[in-house]
Amino acid sequence: MPSVRSVTCCCLLWMMLSVQLVTPGSPGTAQLSGQRTARSSGSTVCKMMCRLGYGHLYPSCGCRGKRDVVSSSMAV
């Protein structure tokens, strides 16, 4: 049975790849209709990545502060 951590990582990876495909203006990515939807879903994923401490993987998200490894809280 897969662990919660591995399932969470798979879900996050899938979401990151999905956002990469629908981000308007990115070179070599698909352009879907409804660009407002693409931006809002990207924003939601960025917020989640920042909260989980993975914002450093996506500099375009502009996360502020660094994740404190010991307490898992954001240090500004």
From Swiss-Prot:
Positions of the propeptide removed during maturation: 25-39, 65-76
Keyword tags: Acetylcholine receptor inhibiting toxin, Amidation, Disulfide bond, Ion channel impairing toxin, Neurotoxin, Postsynaptic neurotoxin, Potassium channel impairing toxin, Secreted, Signal, Toxin, Voltage-gated potassium channel impairing toxin
Organ and tissue specificity: Expressed by the venom duct.
Disulphide bridges, residue numbers: C46-C61, C50-C63
Primary localization class, coarse: secreted
Location in or out of the cell: Secreted
Statement: the UniProt record of this protein carries the keyword Disulfide bond: yes
GO CC entries: extracellular region; host cell postsynaptic membrane
Leader sequence segment: 1-24
Arginine amide PTM positions: R64
Molecular function via GO: acetylcholine receptor inhibitor activity; potassium channel regulator activity; toxin activity
Entry note about domains: The cysteine framework is XIV (C-C-C-C).
Its biological purpose: Highly inhibits both nicotinic acetylcholine receptors (neuronal (alpha-3/beta-4) and muscular (alpha-1/beta-1/epsilon/delta) subtypes) and the voltage-gated potassium channel Kv1.6/KCNA6 subtype.
Record-stated family: Belongs to the conotoxin J superfamily.
Record's protein name: Alpha/kappa-conotoxin-like fe14.2
Organism: Conus ferrugineus
